[in-house]
């Protein structure tokens, strides 16, 4: 086998590989003979079909298969010999056979050489937060509101009330599509409607008819309404006030607490809040570390890896539409290219961190991650057992553990400052509610 390597552009490499033509001819001959022994063709006894007949019927397909196998095998031998690390599947272009040699070209991309830089320039503001008694009480108040019952009242509508109404919206005196509803129910203070709509209902009673003026946000989804001033003619049909359940053992029973009553509920709430806080704190620090790592390391990315990641993201997006992807048009790659490139770059950089620091997934950390995740389920032990019996899930958890270890390794050289933050403020920002 003779091999020449050409760097074409960027990460692309072109291998020209020559192998003795007799190598292919022998493999084709052997394959034809094997096929002749097992072929069943009318007019010939089993195992007695002439090779010339087999060659006429199947020769072209057999030669094509053999050629593909020869190219694949010799390509692998060539990249090992040349110490090349392909980042995607090669494209093979077979050449002509001159009787003595068979030549083909393999084109592919290689992984970039990654040299980590600026690790000591990464700046991280590490938030410190804890769950207080007041935070637990606030969560209980939220749960009370979620389990409230509503009854009609004869007073002005206030924040937290539910109201029922009929309304018609118009812009410049003309009704617009989607701007009309009957028997519409809305909880005031929920933020479901455009700014000013809910505020315009406050202070009105059931039976009143009134008009409110609002302006659609510039980022509103309907193009024809962006930034437009509108009027809504409203007929308020009912005002319903919330009746919150008392905080007692009966309230605790609503959440499956069969023993321990209210104290047991508070313990369970605190445990869940602590778990969510720990996850959010880790995610916050990780995002800062990753952002710093990306900013300080500019590397060339193999297009093959980006294309593969685009396909993954596209498939995930299609599944979010309900999994019915058969009759849906394919989403354009441009929607996912930027995110895909970022994910590829993160993977390459973290891979180098793992390699440089000789990191291996710690079994204790893997089991701790599984236990933390399982604690959110009714029967944690069953979830833990399921994960430990599933090779694919276990590999996913090892990857998560390795990522954590890589982030911790980067933190050792980063500029880290700690900042005390309140639980509610931090979690609101983490979940996008701030």
Curated annotation (Swiss-Prot):
The reaction(s) this protein catalyses: [protein]-peptidylproline (omega=180) = [protein]-peptidylproline (omega=0)
Subcellular location per the Swiss-Prot or TrEMBL entry: Cytoplasm
Enzyme class, first EC level, given as a word: isomerase
Keyword set, alphabetical order: Cell cycle, Cell division, Chaperone, Cytoplasm, Isomerase, Rotamase
One GO BP: protein transport
SUPFAM superfamilies xref list: FKBP-like, Triger factor/SurA peptide-binding domain-like, Trigger factor ribosome-binding domain
GO molecular function (one): protein folding chaperone
Entry-linked InterPro entries: PPIase_dom_sf (IPR046357), PPIase_FKBP_dom (IPR001179), Trig_fac (IPR005215), Trigger_fac_C (IPR008880), Trigger_fac_C_sf (IPR037041), Trigger_fac_ribosome-bd_bac (IPR008881), Trigger_fac_ribosome-bd_sf (IPR036611), Trigger_fact/SurA_dom_sf (IPR027304)
Domain of life, source organism: Bacteria
Keyword Lyase: no
PANTHER family: TRIGGER FACTOR CHAPERONE AND PEPTIDYL-PROLYL CIS/TRANS ISOMERASE, TRIGGER FACTOR-LIKE PROTEIN TIG, CHLOROPLASTIC
Family: Belongs to the FKBP-type PPIase family. Tig subfamily.
Protein name: Trigger factor
The organism of origin for this protein: Shewanella sp. (strain ANA-3)
Name of the gene: tig
């Amino acid at each position: 086998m003779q091999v020449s390597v050409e760097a074409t552009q960027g990460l692309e490499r072109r291998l020209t590989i020559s192998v003795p033509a007799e190598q292919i001819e022998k493999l084709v001959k052997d394959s034809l003979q094997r096929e002749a022994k097992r072929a069943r063709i009318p007019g010939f006894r089993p195992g007695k079909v002439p090779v010339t007949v087999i060659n006429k019927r199947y020769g072209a397909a057999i030669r094509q298969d053999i050629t593909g196998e020869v190219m694949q095998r010799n390509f692998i031998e060539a990249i090992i010999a040349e110490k090349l690390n392909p980042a995607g599947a090669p494209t093979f272009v077979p050449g002509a056979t001159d009787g003595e040699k068979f030549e083909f070209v393999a084109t592919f991309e290689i992984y970039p050489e990654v040299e980590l830089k600026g690790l000591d320039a990464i700046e991280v503001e590490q938030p410190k937060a804890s769950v207080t008694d007041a935070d637990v009480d606030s969560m209980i108040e939220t749960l009370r509101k979620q389990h409230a019952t509503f009854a009609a009242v004869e007073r002005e509508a206030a924040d937290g009330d539910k109201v029922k109404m009929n309304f018609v919206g118009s812009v410049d005196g003309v009704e617009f599509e989607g701007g009309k509803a009957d028997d519409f129910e809305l909880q005031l203070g929920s933020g479901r409607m455009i700014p000013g709509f809910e505020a315009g209902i406050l202070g009105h009673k059931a039976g009143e008819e009134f008009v409110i003026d609002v302006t659609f946000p510039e980022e509103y989804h309907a193009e024809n309404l962006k930034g437009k001033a509108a009027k809504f003619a409203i007929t308020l049909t009912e005002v319903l006030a919330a009746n919150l359940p008392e905080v007692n053992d009966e309230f605790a029973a609503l959440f499956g607490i069969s023993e321990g009553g209210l104290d047991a509920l508070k313990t369970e709430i605190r445990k869940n809040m602590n778990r969510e806080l720990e996850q959010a704190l880790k995610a916050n620090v990780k995002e800062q570390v990753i952002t710093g790592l990306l900013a300080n390391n500019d590397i060339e990315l193999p297009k093959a890896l980006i294309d593969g990641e685009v396909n993954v993201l596209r498939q995930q997006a299609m599944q979010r539409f309900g999994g019915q992807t058969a009759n849906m048009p394919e989403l354009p790659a441009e929607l996912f290219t930027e995110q895909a490139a970022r994910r590829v770059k993160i993977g390459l950089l973290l891979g180098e961190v793992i390699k440089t620091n000789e990191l291996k997934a710690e079994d204790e950390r893997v089991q701790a991650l599984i236990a933390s995740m399982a604690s959110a389920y009714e029967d944690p032990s069953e979830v833990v057992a399921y994960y430990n019996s599933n090779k694919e899930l276990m590999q996913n958890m090892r990857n998560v553990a390795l990522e954590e270890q890589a982030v911790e390794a980067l933190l050792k050289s980063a500029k880290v400052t700690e900042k005390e933050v309140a639980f509610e403020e931090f979690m609101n920002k983490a979940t996008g509610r701030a």
